[in-house]
Amino acid sequence: MPQRFSRVLIPQPRSRFVRLRCPDCGNEQVTFSHAAMVVRCLVCGRVLAQPTGGKAIFAGHVVKVLE
């Protein structure tokens, strides 16, 4: 087979897990980048991620994008 046909392109997902830091209490927690429900801080209850039908809007600081 020619060189160009030997590669198989595998699509990669665009969604990731992210580690968010709460701006009020500094708690860090992991959430999904395309969250379908409101994500609240487990310590103080502040909204960290608001769903939009696609990628969530993050109110907290994104510390790390997990692979």
From Swiss-Prot:
Coiled coil: none
One Gene Ontology CC term in the entry: ribonucleoprotein complex
Zinc finger (C4-type) residue numbers: 22-44
Residue positions binding Zn(2+): 22, 25, 41, 44
One example GO MF annotation: zinc ion binding
One of the protein's GO biological processes: translation
Cofactor note: Binds 1 zinc ion per subunit.
Entry-linked Gene3D superfamilies: Zn-binding ribosomal proteins
Pfam families reported for this sequence: Ribosomal_S27e
Key words, A-Z: Metal-binding, Ribonucleoprotein, Ribosomal protein, Zinc, Zinc-finger
Cofactor: Zn(2+)
Alphabetized PANTHER family for the sequence: 40S RIBOSOMAL PROTEIN S27
Subunit annotation: Part of the 30S ribosomal subunit.
Similarity remark: Belongs to the eukaryotic ribosomal protein eS27 family.
Protein's UniProt name: Small ribosomal subunit protein eS27
Source taxonomy: Archaea, Thermoproteota, Thermoprotei, Thermoproteales, Thermoproteaceae
